[in-house]
């Protein structure tokens, strides 16, 4: 073997994988070919550890136009409108260069959308950081937010929603997941399969440099404590060039001359040529000397592994290349004929007049390693210990508060502490840095509803024309949801809960949930405990998606989210993030989360009994414990609760709707007060529950709604038929001067807290 073990390790390959390469080639690979195998056989590109588990996901449905395998999923919204959507991660790059790591994460996911022929219309993000009391974490968070805002604002795509959570497990390894949505402009989806022997392959976009080299391999290994040395693996983005690329590509696609398109993301030219050829069952001959370079003296392997941003490969009809290139030149972009489609299924790379790579397409893109690892037959020790936890071990509590050893902590103080915790606190400081109204289609923006709502406007209009409003007044809703702590304590139920919460958030704004894109953020799959977490989480996602009728159209897997330190390896919580889109039939029937009118009746849909303190924010913040077992998800009840909420919204009975999730019922009530600027008076009976569980216990299948009192009879008759007693009337909405007043059924006070006090706590965690 001409390579040492250190050589293989540098490329992320094992000795066994090198033997596979030798067998497939019938020889040793040359250094350029080895570099290509290193990135194409990385977890980031070939999903060698997760691919068998992803087969558990449902991927087809009545509205699915494009499922997994293309640059993004596509669903049919009716009336000729198709929606493309996808989520991606940029975790490792954001850890070492947070501004560019986050910014290029936005640029990359936008390319996945417009590569299909869709105009990007919205962005969302899901972020995880370590405690903000650590200056490093706070700086990292600020730079990530700045990077997201920079690219999204400059490229002209609104950032309309997302989520942020804070936990010590993310200190060394933050998570930056970005989701994008787009509406198809082309009559058909632009696919990535190269076709037509002799058709030219065009390189378009920005020039190629040395930034981002081996970025895919970097994303497929644990972060080292001295991760700053990996900064060259982080790409550098240009949103203004990205905007030009969007317009040029959509204009080129409209000519009908483009046969296939693929963005140059992870693994750059290597991945684009191999995947386009593999999907088309053809080969590609490519000449690196025709690639516009921004640096001199680049070696072949540097061209092949560069992940310079804002670049695309196009296969165009022979004879029409000049027509397409003129479009890109007019937009100030590079465009050159750098290759051609060939019949023999090979990736053939030329450099300085010599053939430097000749590899079977299947070896790079299809016959990659797949590892089916054994799944632990029973939960690991940490989970079994957590499940033995009993709430009775907590200090006693009553209607006055929790009686800690040093003093009684009143429920008002508990609520204020929870509202001030970074995971629950207002994220206004973050989302105010994002332009969430550019394009003028955002109907519900951050802080107004449980999901973002975007108006659908025609995307098929000429330059300089104003897009017409649709007579049908349809809209799209989108959300991102995840709870790493729940998945850590129960991967199966925690993953189910993430899917259920995403659907519930869409329901709360009046949308029918349609489909899912998922981002699986986990640790090292070679660790049996991590693989068990991953396997059970995938099973939970699959089961929940089947039950709720939300097929998975694609997604992203981000493994090795661990930090290697002298003390060992620190892994993140297993954190699947669910991106879900929904359809609102009529914009007249949407709902925000805040109270609307004084005197409206407040109802809780769902069962208080299906809650738990296990894994709750209350347990973590007040008692500094991460233990217990999260509440199981009753998917049948979930469907009925969501159906009841949507029906109430569309009948005009329900005036506000808000999901009860992190922080439990009391926090949901406070959020509805703060969002609507009104107090409320309510009565609560704990039943057999402890008071802290009744107030702050967490679970699925619960929605808080306010209802027009004139519709009480019709609403309650419908609820009883639909939910059979699994609902309760809690109280009524007050005025802007009223506090949040919670009492027992016997009229004893539980908590009284003013809007001003709640606002002060809620808006204090994130600020300059």
UniProtKB/Swiss-Prot annotation:
The record's function comment reads: Part of the phosphoribosylformylglycinamidine synthase complex involved in the purines biosynthetic pathway. Catalyzes the ATP-dependent conversion of formylglycinamide ribonucleotide (FGAR) and glutamine to yield formylglycinamidine ribonucleotide (FGAM) and glutamate. The FGAM synthase complex is composed of three subunits. PurQ produces an ammonia molecule by converting glutamine to glutamate. PurL transfers the ammonia molecule to FGAR to form FGAM in an ATP-dependent manner.
| E.C. no | 6.3.5.3
Instruction: Kindly tell me the pathway this chain contributes to.
Output: Purine metabolism; IMP biosynthesis via de novo pathway; 5-amino-1-(5-phospho-D-ribosyl)imidazole from N(2)-formyl-N(1)-(5-phospho-D-ribosyl)glycinamide: step 1/2
Entry GO terms, CC: cytoplasm
The UniProt annotation places substrate binding at: 89-92, 111, 235, 307-309, 558
Listed under catalytic activity are: N(2)-formyl-N(1)-(5-phospho-beta-D-ribosyl)glycinamide + L-glutamine + ATP + H2O = 2-formamido-N(1)-(5-O-phospho-beta-D-ribosyl)acetamidine + L-glutamate + ADP + phosphate + H(+)
Corresponding gene?
purL
Name of the protein = Phosphoribosylformylglycinamidine synthase subunit PurL
Q: Name one GO biological process term.
A: 'de novo' IMP biosynthetic process
- State the organism of origin: Synechococcus sp. (strain JA-2-3B'a(2-13))
């Amino acid at each position: 073997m001409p390579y040492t073990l250190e050589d293989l390790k540098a490329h992320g390959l094992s000795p066994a994988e090198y033997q596979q390469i030798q067998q497939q080639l019938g020889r040793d690979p040359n250094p350029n070919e080895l570099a290509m195998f290193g990135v194409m056989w990385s977890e980031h590109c070939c999903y060698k550890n997760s691919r068998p588990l992803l087969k558990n996901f449902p991927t087809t449905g009545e509205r699915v136009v494009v499922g997994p395998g293309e640059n993004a999923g596509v669903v049919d919204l009716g009336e000729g409108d198709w929606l493309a959507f996808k989520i991606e991660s940029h975790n490792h790059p954001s850890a070492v260069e947070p501004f560019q790591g986050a910014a290029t994460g936005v640029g990359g996911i936008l390319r996945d959308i417009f590569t299909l022929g869709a105009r990007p219309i919205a962005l969302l993000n899901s972020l995880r950081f370590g405690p903000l009391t650590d200056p490093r974490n706070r700086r990292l968070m600020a730079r990530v937010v700045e990077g997201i805002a920079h690219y999204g604002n400059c490229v002209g795509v609104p950032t309309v929603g997302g989520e942020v959570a804070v936990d010590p497990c993310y200190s060394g390894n933050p998570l930056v997941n970005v989701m994008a949505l787009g509406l198809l402009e082309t009559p058909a989806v632009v696919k990535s399969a190269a076709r037509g022997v002799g058709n030219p392959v065009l390189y378009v976009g920005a020039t190629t440099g040395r930034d981002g080299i081996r970025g895919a391999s970097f994303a497929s290994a644990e972060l080292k404590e001295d991760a700053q040395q990996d900064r060259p693996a982080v790409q550098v983005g240009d949103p203004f060039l990205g905007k030009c690329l969007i317009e040029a590509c959509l204009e080129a696609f409209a000519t009908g001359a483009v046969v296939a398109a693929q963005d140059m993301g992870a693994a750059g030219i290597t991945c684009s040529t191999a995947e386009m050829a593999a999907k088309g069952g053809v080969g590609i001959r490519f000449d690196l000397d025709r690639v516009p370079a921004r640096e001199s003296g680049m070696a072949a392997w540097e061209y092949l592994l560069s992940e310079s941003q804002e670049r695309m490969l196009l296969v165009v009809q022979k004879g029409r290349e000049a027509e397409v290139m003129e479009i890109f030149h007019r937009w100030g972009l590079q465009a050159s004929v750098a290759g051609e489609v060939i019949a023999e299924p090979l990736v053939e790379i030329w450099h300085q007049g010599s053939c430097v790579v000749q590899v079977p397409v299947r070896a790079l893109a299809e016959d990659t390693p797949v590892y089916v690892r054994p799944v632990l037959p029973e939960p690991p020790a940490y989970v079994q210990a957590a499940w033995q936890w009993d709430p009775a071990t907590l200090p006693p509590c009553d209607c006055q508060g929790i009686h800690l050893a040093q003093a009684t902590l009143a429920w008002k103080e508990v609520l204020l502490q929870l509202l001030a915790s970074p995971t629950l606190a207002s994220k206004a400081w973050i989302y105010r840095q994002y332009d969430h109204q550019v394009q003028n289609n955002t109907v519900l923006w951050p802080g107004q509803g449980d999901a973002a709502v975007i108006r659908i406007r025609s995307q098929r209009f000429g330059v300089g024309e104003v897009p017409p409003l649709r007579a049908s007044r349809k809209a799209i809703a989108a959300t991102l949801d995840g709870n790493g702590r729940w998945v850590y304590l129960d991967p199966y139920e925690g993953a189910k809960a993430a899917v259920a919460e995403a659907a519930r958030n869409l329901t709360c704004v009046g949308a029918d949930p349609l489909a899912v894109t998922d981002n699986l953020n986990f640790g090292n799959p070679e660790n049996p405990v991590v693989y068990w977490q991953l396997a059970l989480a995938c099973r939970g996602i699959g089961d929940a998606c089947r039950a709720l009728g939300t097929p998975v159209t694609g997604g992203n897997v981000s493994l090795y989210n661990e930090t290697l330190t002298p003390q060992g390896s620190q892994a993140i919580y297993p954190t699947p993030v669910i991106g879900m889109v929904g359809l609102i039939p009529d914009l007249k029937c949407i709902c925000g989360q805040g109270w609307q009118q004084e005197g409206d009746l407040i109802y809780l849909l769902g069962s208080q009994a299906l809650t738990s303190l296990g894994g709750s924010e209350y347990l973590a913040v007040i008692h500094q414990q991460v233990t217990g077992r999260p509440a199981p998800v009753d998917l049948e009840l979930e469907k009925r609760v969501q159906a009841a909420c949507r029906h109430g919204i569309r009948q005009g009975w329900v005036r506000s709707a808000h999901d009860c999730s992190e922080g439990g019922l009391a926090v949901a009530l406070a959020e509805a007060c703060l969002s609507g600027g009104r107090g409320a008076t309510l009565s609560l009976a704990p039943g057999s529950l402890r008071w802290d569980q009744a107030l702050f216990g967490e679970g699925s299948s619960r929605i808080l709604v306010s209802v027009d009192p004139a519709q009480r009879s019709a609403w309650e008759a419908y609820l009883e038929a639909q939910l059979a007693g699994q609902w309760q009337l809690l109280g009524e909405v007050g005025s802007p001067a009223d506090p949040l007043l919670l009492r027992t059924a016997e009229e004893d006070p539980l908590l009284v807290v003013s809007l001003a006090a709640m606002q002060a706590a809620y808006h204090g965690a994130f600020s300059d």
